[in-house]
């Protein structure tokens, strides 16, 4: 779309193509000129401001990229991705590799300060995916959290095989494996803080001299297997400061934050054993069997200090609960209450764990205390067998008081992270916060083991559990994330071997079936709750690819059917190089909130 102008409008009014007498042109113009008030009225219904509210923008808010960037940068291969959420920066990246088959790709990310009346000003350049040897061009996606503007996260997907000869010689991953590269980078601040000024004085003339809060980089890499996990940034980044990573074998919730020594406002983001306060007792009366499970947990940063009386839940909490409840109620009604058995959370959990009833008080360590037992100082509840929690503090220094790196190499569960500052200096991990001085970066990881969860759900909650033999493959899709309650609702598609139902006579050999398990995972306690278990559907003549394709389509349909539009400010900003891989280019870089375009 080109910017509109008066001459365009005049010439367009005088031409009436599209049919005899220009009738087709008039009808098209009528469709294009729908009144703005009507479009705004649709906002009330849909909850979102359509990006096509205005089909064209006036020239005064449209600038050409060639006019604001020196040609040298364009010839250097800069790929411009888009605006940051704040509208202050435009982001671009470059990739470079040698001419021979043994060269690997090097990626750099750039922040440009944008002013509609002047040229772009380069304010930061960083190298992505710290020293990884990447032998094929990557699909890149740069994302920003809904409200956390302090950092961005960059995903690199290796979806195409490298050179065939190189594959054979280097014994690289085959078609059943894909590499995922991730870098989390601090965003340049609008102004220098006191710590940044101290760093500049210590290293005069070095533009990369920044404090840790405004100058850290965190990198990791992992490999996924078929069926390759879906990329869902709208859900994976829905909770600020947290990213959910599907590694094919586990779901890893990672939280990254920067603090200063002695900071009293430090708050653990994951696995803090807090739950939502008990709801006020409901009046006596029969409860409807249609009532779906309610997810009662509340994230610590959103939980105020409750008074002694019964608290009134915030509108956001009530809306989140109502939304989740409506999903399960309608899903059960749509299925006629037969294909999936909806189970409420207050039930004995796997591995001896117990889900807290909404009316039970919370004991030490996040453990539920029955009403008839007096409160007492008990030991914290043991960590469930299906989760693993780690927290490391990364600091700059000479290494005094830090653990040897070999200590962390044996950890096969947590993702390995490399943390550096902008000057390329590695930060060293520590387990104890007490010995930290100055600024430090905290990385929390809470890992949910998929296979453990699958076995526990089948053993405790599946009505067909006695028929089950083994499962051969599974696929995980996130259906919803509630940042208010810290609940993650996931769907586990499962291919398994099971004996036929006893009603089928003469069938003594196991068959291949497909089913789905829905569980809700609490990021505060680490405990999962079985939401529903699907019936067994026999796989007859279908390939695994067609099974997973149908399964993912059903997940998309479910998500879209119950989608609640986010407010205009609470969305995950996403910029990709997808157009480049399709062999085309974006037409404009649009800042939809401030109605500004950069025409490419």
From Swiss-Prot:
Keywords: Immunity, Metal-binding, Phosphoprotein, Ubl conjugation pathway, Zinc. Residues 1-30, 277-316, 333-383 are annotated as: Disordered. Substrate-recognition component of the DCX(DCAF15) complex, a cullin-4-RING E3 ubiquitin-protein ligase complex that mediates ubiquitination and degradation of target proteins. The DCX(DCAF15) complex acts as a regulator of the natural killer (NK) cells effector functions, possibly by mediating ubiquitination and degradation of cohesin subunits SMC1A and SMC3. May play a role in the activation of antigen-presenting cells (APC) and their interaction with NK cells. The modification Phosphoserine is found at residues 50, 314. This is DDB1- and CUL4-associated factor 15. One of its GO terms (biological process) is immune system process. Residues 296-306 have a biased composition (Low complexity).
């Amino acid at each position: 779309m080109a910017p509109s102008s008066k001459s365009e409008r005049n010439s367009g009014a005088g031409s009436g193509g599209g049919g005899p007498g220009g009738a087709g042109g008039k009808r098209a113009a009528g469709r294009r000129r729908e009144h703005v008030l009507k479009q705004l009225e649709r906002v009330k219904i849909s909850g979102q401001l359509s990006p096509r509210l205005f089909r064209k923008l006036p020239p005064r808010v449209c600038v050409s990229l060639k006019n604001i960037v020196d040609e040298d940068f364009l010839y250097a291969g800069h790929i411009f991705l888009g605006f940051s959420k704040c509208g202050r920066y435009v982001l671009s990246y470059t990739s470079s590799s040698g001419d021979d088959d043994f060269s690997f790709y090097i990626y750099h990310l750039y922040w440009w300060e944008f002013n509609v009346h002047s040229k772009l000003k380069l304010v930061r350049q960083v190298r992505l995916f710290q020293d990884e040897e990447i032998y094929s061009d990557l699909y890149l996606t740069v994302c920003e959290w809904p409200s956390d503007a302090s950092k961005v996260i960059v995903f690199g997907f290796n979806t195409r095989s490298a050179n065939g000869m190189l594959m054979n010689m280097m014994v690289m991953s085959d078609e059943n494996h894909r590499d995922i590269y991730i870098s989390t980078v601090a965003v340049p601040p609008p102004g220098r803080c006191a710590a940044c000024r101290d760093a500049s004085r210590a290293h005069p003339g070095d533009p990369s001299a920044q404090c840790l809060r405004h100058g850290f980089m965190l990198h990791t890499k992992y490999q996924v297997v078929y069926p390759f996990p879906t990329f869902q940034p709208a859900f994976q980044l829905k909770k600020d400061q947290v990213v959910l990573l599907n590694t094919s074998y586990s779901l890893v919730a990672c939280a990254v934050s920067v603090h200063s020594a002695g900071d009293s406002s430090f708050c653990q983001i994951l696995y803090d054993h807090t739950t939502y306060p008990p709801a006020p007792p409901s009046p006596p009366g029969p409860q409807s069997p249609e009532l779906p499970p309610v997810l009662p947990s509340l994230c610590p940063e959103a939980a105020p200090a409750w008074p002694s009386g019964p608290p009134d839940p915030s509108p956001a909490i009530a809306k989140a609960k109502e939304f989740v409840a409506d999903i399960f109620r309608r899903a059960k009604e749509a299925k006629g209450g037969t294909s999936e058995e909806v189970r409420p959370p207050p039930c004995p959990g796997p591995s001896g764990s117990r889900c807290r009833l909404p009316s039970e008080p919370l004991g030490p360590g996040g453990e539920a205390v029955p009403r008839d037992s007096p409160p007492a100082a008990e030991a914290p509840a043991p960590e469930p067998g299906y989760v693993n929690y780690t927290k490391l503090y990364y600091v700059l220094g000479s290494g005094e008081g830090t653990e040897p790196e070999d200590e962390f190499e044996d950890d096969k569960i947590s993702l390995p992270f490399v943390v550096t500052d902008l000057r390329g200096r590695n930060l060293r991990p520590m387990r104890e916060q007490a010995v930290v001085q100055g600024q430090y970066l905290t990385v929390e990881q809470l890992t949910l083991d998929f296979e453990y969860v699958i076995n526990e759900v089948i053993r405790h909650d599946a009505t067909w559990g006695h028929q089950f033999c083994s499962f051969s493959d599974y696929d995980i899709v996130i259906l919803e994330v509630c940042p208010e309650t810290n609940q993650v609702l996931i769907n586990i598609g499962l291919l398994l071997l099971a004996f036929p139902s006893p009603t089928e006579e003469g069938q003594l050999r196991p068959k291949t079936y497909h089913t789905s398990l829905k569980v809700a995972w609490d990021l505060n306690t680490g405990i999962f709750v079985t939401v529903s278990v699907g019936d067994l559907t026999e796989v007859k003549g279908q390939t695994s690819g067609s099974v997973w394709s149908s399964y993912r389509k059903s997940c998309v349909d479910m998500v879209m059917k119950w989608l609640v539009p986010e407010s205009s400010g609470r969305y995950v900003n996403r910029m990709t190089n997808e157009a480049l891989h399709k062999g085309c280019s974006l037409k404009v870089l649009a800042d939809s909130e401030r109605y500004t375009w950069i025409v490419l």
